[in-house]
Amino acid sequence: VSLAALALAAAPREASPQEVSRLFAENASGHPRLFLRDYRTLEESRKTATGSAMTGRILHDSGKMLGYPVVERRMTGNQMLSVSRNILYRINTLAIAYRLSGDRRYADKAVAEMRNAAAFPDWNPQHFLDVAELTLAMAFGYDWLYDLLDENDRQLFEQAIIEKGILPSYGEPRYNWCQVCHAGMTAGALAVFERNPELAAKTIARAVNCLPPAMRASYYPKGAYPEGPVYWSYGSEFNVALLAMLESALGTDFGLA
């Protein structure tokens, strides 16, 4: 309902790269900056019944992942979305497991997946959802494991996020999945902002300005999605993630919530 209400509200103001840069300087020093700013939030969440159950599931799944080989780059037709999603799930789960447990094995396995993905020749920009989800994975791992990464890994992951994630998004438009693609690009831009501030600010402003028409098309007038509930869930998950990242890193969602 709240998403659908956006269509009835006054249009959110446009964001400029200059404003994004100012907000970043005021709010986003240090890591983590994606989704939360203090890992103690995780400890607080474990005190609830839901948080305790989720912690058990995360640690269980991460324990199994320790024995898995890294994910191979394998095409299915013209896409590798299952590869990107697998990597996203592994890196996110392993990074959270490390922060919950302090067990370095989880972090090391996440970094191994990141090195492997960074070595892919590309992230398949012909099917840009693949790029978006893989960029989100790499950004999350980079941000949440930043203090454990040596300088070589930091540079490797920064370069991969920019060259295989963000820069291809400025090519000839071949996709219309605004919520998913801009969530991935925003994650990458926020995570490695200092590496290329001008590109990062432009990328984030572009995402903020793209989202209102996409949300209107997706949820107006009653919250239903024209392509059905599965795509509603898919787009909405990334829509919410994008707003959460803007709020945690920049201190505002630009009136989009």
Model-identified regions with their sequence ranges:
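Short acidic, Pro/Gly- and aromatic-enriched capping/linker segments at domain boundaries
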Residues: 15-32
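Bacterial Sec-dependent signal peptides at the C-terminal "C-region" and cleavage site
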Residues: 6-18
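Sec-dependent signal peptide recognition
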Residues: 1-2
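Aromatic-lined, polymer-binding surfaces characteristic
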Residues: 25, 33, 39, 46-47, ...
